[in-house]
Design a protein with these regions (language model features):
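Juxtamembrane intracellular "pre-TM" segments in multi-pass secondary transporters
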Residues: 1-7, 203-246
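Extracytoplasmic gate region of multi-pass secondary transporters
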Residues: 30-35, 241-293
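Cytoplasmic helix-loop-helix junction between adjacent transmembrane helices
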Residues: 116-153
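Helix-loop-helix hairpin linking two adjacent transmembrane segments in secondary transporters
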Residues: 150-201
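A membrane-interface helix-boundary motif in multi-pass transporters
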Residues: 170-183, 388-408
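C-terminal transmembrane helical hairpin of 12-TM major facilitator-type secondary transporters
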Residues: 302-352
Length: 428
């Protein structure tokens, strides 16, 4: 059967990164403007924390089944489904603002706002889909750099939007800002439709080529990683590997924490230090974009030093940053702590996904689903805990809340050490 295989590794990487970029921006859906909803709706600190974190709930949990779905389809279909759901949620948020904001947007609409936030967060779940899609395009020895580029560039979106949203608020207002976001998301979906291609094996299978022949021809085209199981089997294989759960714990700290802080930092900077929304957005962007960009060289570092060693070193940096934020009452030291956390979290995130294909080569999507899904759940779980510190201790609760990251960093260092022992024993 003569079937043409379209695309290339580079095109596959560009397509996946584009789709992830526009979907992942929903991490900053409410963070930069949460104070506006708090004022008009009369929300408590904990309610604000749940609002900014809710997109990450669906964005994390949906990564599990959709990440595993990649092992049967190659990623294109899951990507388009998630991005379309996110677009629907964004349109709903915009319509609610146009119809009710500010005078009629009362607290009784809070559940509806949470639902639309959850729907908008579906785009965040594209992360594990893209991880699998890119991993099937590239050979294992280039997974650190390719996945680092994918995740690092895609992760820039929340920080960029946290910086731009306060600017567009001044120019276009709240409704105009969200409308511009919707247009950008729609353009991103169209761009992914044109560029987001599956790896050769999946293209051949979709064209009706028998599995053995599709595998042989894909190998001739340079593909080295192949699925060997369906969705349930892929998740099952991954779940039976203890190393999967070590990566989940580490990723909960570094990537879940990254999402949590990207959503929480605008509130922290404005409420604790009294900064303007523009300055708070800029500082949040420095953290978020910094953690994202450093993920690219972090992937190359993991290729050279190994994922486990890179994870341990970067987690120590994260711990130091968290200690500074917990104990510092000064602005300068708090900024230093945030920068150190950005460096540590960004590099560790790259190290984790250098290790994902090593855990189960035959079920990359399953491992990526568990790690990306449950790990990213930290983005939903952590902000309400930090909000509870504020509710209990007032202003002093803002720095005290970072003790959560101190504990998580220590726990993750232990997990990384145990992971090193498990993988070393397997290869011995």
């Amino acid at each position: 059967m003569n079937v043409h295989v379209a695309g290339s590794r580079t095109r596959g990487l560009i397509g996946a990164t584009t789709g992830f970029f526009v979907g992942f921006a929903a991490v900053s859906l409410f963070g930069p403007v949460a104070h506006r909803f708090q004022e008009v709706m009369g929300l408590t600190p904990v309610m604000v924390a749940f609002l900014v974190a809710t997109p990450s709930l669906t964005g994390s949990l949906l990564r599990i089944p959709f990440g595993a779905w990649v092992d049967t389809t190659g990623g294109r279909k899951p990507f388009l489904v998630l991005l379309s759901l996110s677009l629907l949620g964004m349109v709903g948020v915009w319509a609610l603002i146009v119809a009710l904001y500010p005078d009629h947007l009362v607290v009784s609409f809070y559940p509806l706002l949470l639902f639309l936030a959850a729907l908008s967060g579906c785009g965040i779940a594209t992360f594990s889909v893209g991880i699998g899609q890119v991993a099937y395009w590239y050979p294992p020895e280039r997974h650190g750099s390719s996945l680092g580029a994918y995740a690092g560039l895609g992760n820039i979106a929340p920080g960029l939007f946290a910086f731009l949203l306060p600017i567009t608020l001044t120019a276009w207002g709240l409704a105009g800002s969200y409308l511009a976001w919707i247009i950008l998301l729609g353009a991103g979906i169209a761009a992914y439709w044109l560029t987001g291609l599956n790896a050769p094996f999946f293209q051949l299978r979709r064209a009706g080529v028998p599995e053995d022949e599709a595998r042989r021809r894909a190998e001739e085209l340079g593909q080295k990683v192949f699925p060997s199981a369906g969705i349930r089997a892929s998740l099952g294989i991954a779940a039976r590997r203890s190393a999967t759960w070590s990566l989940v714990g580490i990723y909960f700290t570094t990537f879940g924490g990254f999402i949590a802080l990207t959503a929480w930092f605008p509130t922290y900077w404005m409420s604790y230090f009294g900064l303007s929304i523009g300055t708070a957005g800029t500082l949040t962007a420095i953290y978020s974009v910094g953690a994202s960009v450093i993920r690219v060289p972090g992937g190359s570092l993991a290729d050279r030093l190994g994922g486990e060693a890179t994870a341990v070193g970067s987690l120590v940096v994260t711990l130091v940053g968290a200690l500074l934020l917990t104990s510092s009452p000064t602005f300068a030291l708090s900024v230093t702590g945030a920068v150190l956390m950005a460096i540590g979290m960004g590099i560790c995130n790259a190290a984790v996904f250098k290790l994902v294909p090593q855990v189960a080569k035959e079920a990359v999507g399953g491992v990526a689903g568990w790690v990306g899904g449950l790990g990213a759940f930290g983005g939903f779980a952590i902000p309400p805990i930090m909000g509870a510190f504020v509710s209990a201790r007032g202003q002093a609760g803002y720095p005290l809340g970072f003790v959560v990251f101190v504990a998580l960093a220590v726990f993750s260092i232990v997990l990384a050490w145990l992971l090193h022992r498990r993988l070393a024993a397997r290869t011995a």
